[in-house]
């Protein structure tokens, strides 16, 4: 929470006499650079973001009642949990158990930057987390002329082997977002932009588009500001990329294999990737050629039986 949060303001005023002092991680024997007269734990060194004590039942109850109010008053269908990797696992389990009672299809989406996503995702934790592992490969595989990177990342996460990490899960997949440089600024060759979106819409998971990127707008993450990533846009700028992404989204939406099917690499080179998504009664092949020249691939494509989605 911010320093202006009412319970924290009460602690600033009443110190150890505040009934909310245990809502935070506080040491009255210390101080801060803001001279509060006590030390408090903050998020990753940012003193304007005060860390709540999620082991305190009163804090948890306050949050749960707020969530209940949002559901009853506004009909929300889920929560995106910022920096979910910082949350205690026991708290995540409590949150999941509570929200399951509000709506059977209420979704918890957690932000996770790395590590084993199963730490925060599962039947008693978040339904899904952000797939930063494959986000990086979506652009660097093209820039480095190394489609092995994204191919191996997807196979590690979703491949047919019994040891793969997230088979059956729906990680949130993205090419850019509010915290990272936009895809159109990241890729060295603009012609690779539609190819990256083809992989995004074809790979397992739940694809997400960051506003404006469907038009191909650029934006660099700054050292001190994210303003360039988050412009105020007046009107849509529909173009060929927008139309291409709309076609990809429609193909995915109408395909059981692309939505829920298995994953298998069929062909993989530095500049080409073909992977298979398969569900009962449907087999889809996603083929991407990052080279500037045509490529002849030899594999079982089901000639005479296939059609272009």
Where is each model-derived feature located?
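Substrate-binding/active-site clefts of carbohydrate-active enzymes
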Residues: 1-69, 73, 95-101, 118
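Active-site-proximal helices and loops of the catalytic beta/alpha 8
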Residues: 2, 8-13, 68, 72, ...
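The substrate-binding groove and active-site-proximal loops of carbohydrate-active enzymes
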Residues: 45-60, 77-86, 139-145, 179-189, ...
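Structural preference for beta-strand elements that scaffold enzyme active sites
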Residues: 76-80, 105-109, 129, 170-173, ...
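Acidic/polar loop patches that form or flank catalytic/metal-binding clefts of enzymes
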Residues: 109-110, 207-212, 256-262, 307
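Substrate-binding cleft of secreted/luminal carbohydrate-active enzymes
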Residues: 197-200, 204-218
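Surface beta-strand/loop "capping" patches
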Residues: 260-282
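Asparagine-centered strand-capping/turn motif at beta-strand->loop junctions
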Residues: 287-291
